[in-house]
């Protein structure tokens, strides 16, 4: 077996050989601890028949661990400068395909259809750049890809927010949006010291297991999420005040009061105390008016 890419010495050698410099604008932080990478792969529960989709492979540290476990790996890399590096570091692995494209602009569903077998066990596994964590995760979830789940290394604070429960200070619109599509579980906390360059914050590995169907049924998903966003626009305001100022307007205050009453929600409550079921009920009541 080839020597792991993710050691401080080998990472330094690869970067020096290719004259690579980190781009802050791309949020590039490379993992230099093989044990952490193996933990990520373990959380994904891949089998020799699984397929893996990676985002932001960097120099291939996580990619090689995935390639050793999965039948096939597809990795999206936005940075053209890393393509020749990956061609070299991943040369021993014939089951890896690297696509030089921004995953936010890519047709991931089409890539899956042309790369993997129909019905194959698929997982998204990635060490995501902090600055695009939420857009990437929401794109993947909203696309309703044929994957079992998503395992990502992200900023610990964001992972806490995604996995948060009602009534906690971390709970917000991101928690509800993610948990509408998947169950969320914090798997491993990761210190900032295992990255180069070292970021300012710690990370966490988050496991999202895709739901067969959402926990609630609503006529209009966009309307549900609009209500959720409005309800958290000002965390110190009541649900009624947030709805009036951020969604329905003062002229429709009576309708908001009626909808809350019909949904059995005290108008003096704050958004952070509402469950997704209560938000779904509220969205249906507001839509009637």
UniProtKB/Swiss-Prot annotation:
EC numbers for this chain: 2.1.1.182
Leader sequence residues: none
Annotated SUPFAM superfamilies: S-adenosyl-L-methionine-dependent methyltransferases (SSF53335)
Enzyme class per UniProt: transferase
Chemical reaction(s) catalysed: adenosine(1518)/adenosine(1519) in 16S rRNA + 4 S-adenosyl-L-methionine = N(6)-dimethyladenosine(1518)/N(6)-dimethyladenosine(1519) in 16S rRNA + 4 S-adenosyl-L-homocysteine + 4 H(+)
One cellular-component annotation, GO: cytosol
Domain of life of the source: Bacteria
Subcellular location: Cytoplasm
GO molecular function annotations of the record: 16S rRNA (adenine(1518)-N(6)/adenine(1519)-N(6))-dimethyltransferase activity; RNA binding
Pfam families xrefs: RrnaAD
Residues noted as binding S-adenosyl-L-methionine in the record, renumbered to the chain: 29, 31, 56, 77, 102, 127
Keywords: Cytoplasm, Methyltransferase, RNA-binding, rRNA processing, S-adenosyl-L-methionine, Transferase
SMART domains per record: rADc
Cysteine disulfide partners in this protein: none
Family: Belongs to the class I-like SAM-binding methyltransferase superfamily. rRNA adenine N(6)-methyltransferase family. RsmA subfamily.
Classification via PANTHER family: DIMETHYLADENOSINE TRANSFERASE, DIMETHYLADENOSINE TRANSFERASE-RELATED
Function noted in UniProt: Specifically dimethylates two adjacent adenosines (A1518 and A1519) in the loop of a conserved hairpin near the 3'-end of 16S rRNA in the 30S particle. May play a critical role in biogenesis of 30S subunits.
Protein name per its UniProtKB record: Ribosomal RNA small subunit methyltransferase A
Species per Swiss-Prot/TrEMBL record: Halalkalibacterium halodurans (strain ATCC BAA-125 / DSM 18197 / FERM 7344 / JCM 9153 / C-125) (Bacillus halodurans)
Organism taxonomic ancestry: Bacteria, Bacillati, Bacillota, Bacilli, Bacillales
């Amino acid at each position: 077996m080839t020597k792991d890419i993710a050691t401080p010495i080998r990472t330094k050698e690869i970067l020096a050989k290719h004259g690579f410099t980190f781009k802050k604008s791309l949020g590039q932080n490379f993992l230099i601890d093989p044990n952490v990478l193996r933990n990520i792969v373990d959380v994904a529960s891949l089998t020799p028949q699984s397929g893996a989709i990676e985002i932001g492979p960097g120099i291939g540290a996580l990619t090689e661990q995935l390639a050793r476990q999965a039948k096939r790996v597809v990795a999206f890399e936005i940075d053209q400068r890393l393509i020749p590096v990956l061609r070299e570091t991943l040369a021993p692995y014939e089951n890896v395909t690297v696509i030089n494209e921004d995953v936010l602009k890519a047709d991931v569903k089409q890539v899956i259809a042309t790369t993997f077998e129909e019905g194959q066990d698929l997982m998204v596994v990635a060490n995501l750049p902090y600055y695009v964590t939420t857009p990437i995760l929401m794109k993947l979830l909203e696309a309703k890809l044929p994957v079992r789940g998503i395992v990502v290394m992200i900023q610990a604070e964001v992972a806490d927010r995604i996995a948060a429960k009602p009534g906690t200070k971390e709970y917000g619109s991101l928690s509800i949006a993610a948990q509408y599509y998947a169950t969320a579980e914090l798997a491993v906390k990761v210190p900032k010291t295992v990255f180069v360059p070292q970021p300012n914050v710690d990370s966490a590995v988050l496991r999202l297991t895709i739901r067969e169907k959402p926990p609630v049924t609503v006529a209009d998903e966009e309307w549900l999420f609009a209500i959720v966003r409005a309800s958290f626009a000002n965390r110190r305001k009541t649900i009624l005040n947030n709805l009036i100022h951020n969604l329905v307007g003062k002229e429709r205050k009576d309708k908001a009061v009626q909808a809350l009453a019909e949904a059995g929600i005290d108008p003096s409550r704050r958004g952070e105390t509402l469950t997704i079921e209560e938000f779904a009920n509220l969205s249906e009541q507001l839509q009637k008016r």
